[in-house]
Amino acid sequence: MSWMGHHFSRWCKDISVLSSHLPLFSPMPSEDEHLISNLRSHVPARVVVKQPIRGAIGRTTVAAIVQTGGDWSTGLFSVCRDRKICFWGLLCPMCLECDIARHYGECLCWPLLPGSTFALRIGTRERHRIQGTLCEDCVVVHCCWPFSICQVARELKMRTSQLYEICEVPELKNTLV
């Protein structure tokens, strides 16, 4: 077997379409993913600045923390950083783009529309306050389409919101009289 055939066959054993699970590419979202996707609305996340009030026992606060600002977390050609996204983005970019559209609550037919990748990239950049221009996005999407989809998928995977549950500890009563 040639060098290329040896490495390709080893890679195919590691990744199979049926056994791979992309966090952004799952046929049936679990209840947790549905809860998280509902919390990811188009409204920007707010920072919790108010501390729990004394005497409010049993109240629970859920805070979503979303990383925003800065540049893209990975470069356009850093495709091999995530093997699953690389696999889906380079062999079936439409499938990966469908998954990104599902992540944003769009129809799975979204990638069939002209300019859909451009809109998804701009939406991701604006939602996470990533620096860049429309001209840069246009050039990247039209010249490096599969790489652009992979970069957006990696960005969404790295910038997913983290949920924290904040519970107030019940106050201990003084038992000494």
From Swiss-Prot:
Disulfide-bonded cysteines: none
NCBIfam families given in the database record: A_thal_Cys_rich (TIGR01571)
Record-linked Pfam families: PLAC8
Alphabetical list of InterPro entries matching this protein: PLAC_motif_containing (IPR006461)
Protein name in UniProt: PLAC8-like protein 1
Domain of life: Eukaryota
Similarity field: Belongs to the cornifelin family.
